[in-house]
Amino acid sequence: MSLGNTTVVTTTVRNATPSLTLDAGTIERFLAHSHRRRYPTRTDVFRPGDPAGTLYYVISGSVSIIAEEDDDRELVLGYFGSGEFVGEMGLFIESDTREVILRTRTQCELAEISYERLQQLFQTSLSPDAPRILYAIGVQLSKRLLDTTRKASRLAFLDVTDRIVRTLHDLSKEPEAMSHPQGTQLRVSRQELARLVGCSREMAGRVLKKLQADGLLHARGKTVVLYGTR
């Protein structure tokens, strides 16, 4: 379909990421002991300096983990969706306060349980499920370490254009990405893209214009169609 001023796009949402290595029964038993809470879009669930004593599990929606500098600049460290744990480091490394921001990207439902309570349950009613839950958390930690290593390498060795191209391709694999007749449709603002790659909003906008002129994508507002990624 045309990408002009009157574009109408028929889209289908990609399948959500399945809960890593956890079966439905294990999830249900874990959730039975957790407090479920709903959060609006763009809500900070916790910020640096907040007490660190809770494990979160994303039931629905999408969240971002963000590092914040003293001058209020932000760098997005990762996006996490349904079936993923957040704040899991506290199960293994004792820390009194949070060091990053957990912010909702969409309306979310999160399950929350204190580390102390979960450790007690691992010795009692959740004892049979403890190996599976801990293994799932280990898988997620390993994946996030690989993602962080890749992001650090990009910051060190790639220019802004290459970082943005690779980040857009990463976003095309996220559950929120939608199929499009010419590739993949993403919803990401210049500000969000800048936070993902570590540059200014203005620089992100200039790079998108260049990539559009080169025929690699079409960008309008917060909508980006990345060509050739179906």
UniProtKB/Swiss-Prot annotation:
Induction: Expression is induced by DSF signal, via the RpfC/RpfG two-component system. One of its GO terms (cellular component) is cytosol. The keyword Transcription regulation applies. It comes from the Bacteria. Coiled coil: none annotated. Changing residue 150 to A: Decrease in DNA-binding. Keywords: Activator, Allosteric enzyme, c-di-GMP, Cytoplasm, DNA-binding, Repressor, Transcription, Transcription regulation, Virulence. Gene3D superfamilies: Jelly Rolls, Winged helix-like DNA-binding domain superfamily/Winged helix DNA-binding domain. GO terms for molecular function: catalytic activity; cyclic-di-GMP binding; DNA binding; DNA-binding transcription factor activity; protein dimerization activity. Changing residue 70 to A: Almost no change in DNA-binding, but decrease in c-di-GMP-binding. Residues 158-230 form the HTH crp-type domain. Allosterically inhibited by cyclic di-GMP (c-di-GMP), which binds to Clp and abolishes its ability to bind its target gene promoter. A nucleoside 3',5'-cyclic phosphate binds at residues 18-139. Global transcriptional regulator that regulates virulence factors production by activating or repressing the expression of a large set of genes in diffusible signal factor (DSF) pathway. It includes, among others, genes involved in extracellular polysaccharide (EPS) synthesis, flagellum synthesis, protein and fatty acid metabolism, multidrug resistance, iron uptake or genes encoding extracellular enzymes, membrane components and a few transcription factors. Regulation can be direct or indirect, via regulation of other transcriptional regulators. Not involved in DSF-mediated biofilm dispersal. This is CRP-like protein Clp.
